[in-house]
Amino acid sequence: MSERIDFDVNDEDLRREFLCDVLPRAIASLESHTQSRWGGMSAQQMVEHLTWAFDLSTGTRQVECPYAEDKRARLKAFLYDNRPSPQDFMNPALVGGLPPLEHPALPEARAALLASVRRFLDPPDEGTDVRHMHPIFGPLDRDEWSRTHFKHGFHHLSQFGLVARRDDERAP
């Protein structure tokens, strides 16, 4: 059964609650045999994909952004509108397919994700101007990464039936 949550990317407290409470609770309930409702990811692939994104946001991993600055600015507007990511969205960084799994099983992948989330939530004092590269939006600051993680996390947790918008009548 999906946990029904409010969806408001512009509510900083709600985003923090999602990252601190909803995401860890949902990931804890995920089983390796849980099937996605759309897309081709397994449960472990989804968890490792989220870890990758959190690692980008802390500078633990790096990626290039192929888009010119003017296109990045247009794409970045998505971080501020209150629409969820579409189900059929294809990340250009994954056009060649999903990377190989890094962990032997879901429990290890889950632990790695939770550690990455903690690194994002409790960063070392690195100043307020620090930006890390996103593969679509370009360099993002902490607020923009928080918006990204909220939308991205909601998208993938919805993909596996772990969360749904409180106001979505169609959700189970």
Language model features with spans:
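Short, helix-capping/interhelical loops that line the mouth of catalytic, cofactor-
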Residues: S2-D8, G59-L113, F120-P123
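Hydrophobic packing residues in well-ordered alpha-helices of helical domains and bundles
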Residues: C20-L23, L106, R110-L113, S146-H149
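Short helix/strand-capping connector loops at secondary-structure junctions
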Residues: M90-L98, T128-D141
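N-terminus-centered regions that define maturation/targeting leaders and the start
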Residues: L50, L113-S116
